[in-house]
């Protein structure tokens, strides 16, 4: 299922970029955009995880640098039947964490300095088990590619606005789609980016919560961690967070009103906590 979702995401990106090329440069623009999209798809597959980690200034750590945290991840990886992922720390006081990579053999988990400070060892174990569940369930590729694609589409939308304003007088079919086509694509592009992010199903968070609770063996530890993170992340939002990558994190790093909640890629926190608390009163299989 995740392979199908990844293919659909890449196809959507290709079609959108071809449409953008047509709006700006007609048939020649379509051809150029098609080859550019193909190159971006290959680049996203191989390098999107590195881009996301660099975007947040994540620093890879060794066991010697942080034996407690590194050892915790290694122990949980063994319990989950996974290869040892690379471990990163993000220099941010806002408490959060995410997983990224192509597959279990090329995976990384990252946690902020803030989450390492405010959670108890048991709560942190629940959070990292959740992130390793994304690796085990192979959510990480589609999540990371979605982040790269959404960011690229938003950037192209901004470029199209300027192109439509300063170069949109042409209306020849061969040379360009004109100002109206460029403006239309500038409006469509950010909406498409939002829809791509929403395509990364909310249900994967529920599954990662459940799988993570089974890996660490303590649903209440993860429930308590989510409750604490939900409160702390609102009081101390991640200033460097970007909408294109918000869906990667265990809790939404963005702050906003009802509209943000409506289009959030994360399920309601109270529902996630309730499901975990219900798990605590039945045998874990």
Swiss-Prot record:
Task: Give Gene Ontology CC terms.
Answer: plasma membrane
Name the UniProt key words of this record, in alphabetical order: Cell inner membrane, Cell membrane, Hydrolase, Membrane, Metal-binding, Metalloprotease, Protease, Transmembrane, Transmembrane helix, Zinc
The molecular function GO annotations come to:
metalloendopeptidase activity; zinc ion binding
Q: Name one Pfam family in it.
A: Peptidase_M48
One GO biological-process annotation of the entry reads: proteolysis
What gene name does this entry carry? htpX
Q: Which PANTHER family does UniProt cross-reference here?
A: PROTEASE HTPX
In the bilayer, the protein is annotated as: Multi-pass membrane protein
Protein's name according to its UniProt entry: Protease HtpX homolog
Q: Where does Zn(2+) bind?
A: 130, 134, 205
Q: Where in the cell is it found?
A: Cell inner membrane
Transmembrane portions of the chain: 6-26, 28-48, 140-160, 176-196
């Amino acid at each position: 299922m995740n392979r199908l979702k990844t293919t659909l995401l890449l196809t959507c990106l290709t079609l959108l970029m071809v449409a953008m090329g047509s709006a700006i440069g007609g048939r020649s623009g379509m051809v150029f955009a098609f080859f550019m999209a193909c190159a971006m798809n290959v680049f996203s597959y191989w390098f999107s995880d590195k881009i996301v980690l660099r975007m947040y200034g994540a620093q890879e750590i060794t066991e010697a640098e942080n034996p407690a945290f590194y050892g915790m991840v290694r122990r949980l990886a063994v319990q989950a039947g996974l290869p040892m992922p690379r471990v990163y720390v993000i220099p941010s006081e806002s408490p959060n964490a995410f997983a990224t990579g192509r597959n279990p053999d090329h995976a990384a988990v990252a946690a902020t300095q803030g989450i390492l400070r405010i959670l108890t060892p048991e709560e942190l174990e629940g959070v990292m088990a959740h992130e390793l569940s994304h690796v085990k369930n192979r959510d990480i590729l589609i999540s990371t590619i979605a982040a790269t694609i959404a960011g690229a589409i938003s950037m192209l939308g901004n470029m199209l606005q300027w192109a439509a304003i300063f170069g949109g007088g042409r209306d020849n079919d061969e040379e360009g789609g004109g100002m109206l086509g460029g403006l239309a694509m500038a409006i469509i592009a950010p909406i498409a980016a939002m829809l791509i992010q929403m395509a990364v199903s909310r249900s994967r968070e529920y599954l990662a919560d459940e799988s993570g609770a089974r890996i660490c063996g303590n649903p209440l530890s993860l429930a308590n961690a989510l409750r604490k993170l939900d409160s702390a992340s609102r009081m101390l939002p991640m200033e460097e967070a970007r909408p294109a990558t918000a869906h990667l994190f265990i809790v939404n790093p963005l702050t906003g009103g009802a509209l943000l909640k409506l289009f959030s890629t994360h399920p309601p926190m109270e529902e996630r906590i309730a499901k975990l608390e219900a798990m605590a009163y039945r045998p874990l299989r």
